[in-house]
Amino acid sequence: MSENAMLRHGAFSWCELMTADVEAAKRFYTELLGWTTEEVPGMSYTLVKTGDTGIGGIMAAPPQATGAPPQWGIYVTVDDVDATARKAQALGATTIVPLTDIPNVGRFYTFQDPQGAVISIITYRMQGASL
């Protein structure tokens, strides 16, 4: 099995759209880019795929985001999310979403860098697995 480059430390590995209108977003992006979508059982989450490969997701924005424009978020793979989160904080990052476990996926942390950009880091449960 070949290594998935997106699972290497420092690689962009996942994108998610938070929007007030999930159905409209699904229609737009499937028509525009040829993506396919698949509902994730037991979650309010739509998996976005190109071919057989999951590349991201679409989900409803939380109530506290009412009035905010839809936005894409990106995840960067790291070898140790806890250590990298501590390092980000030491370098001046502000926590947006604290360290959080995603069942059967991994653990992530979302922060705002000192310049104001928001990004998420993630360590996948099985770093050698395909996405």
Indicate where each model-derived feature is located.
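Intrinsic, low-complexity N-terminal interaction/targeting segments
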Residues: 39-66, 83-86, 95
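Core segments of cupin and vicinal oxygen chelate
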Residues: 2, 9-54, 90
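Vicinal oxygen chelate
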Residues: 1-8, 12-20, 47-49, 64-87, 91-131
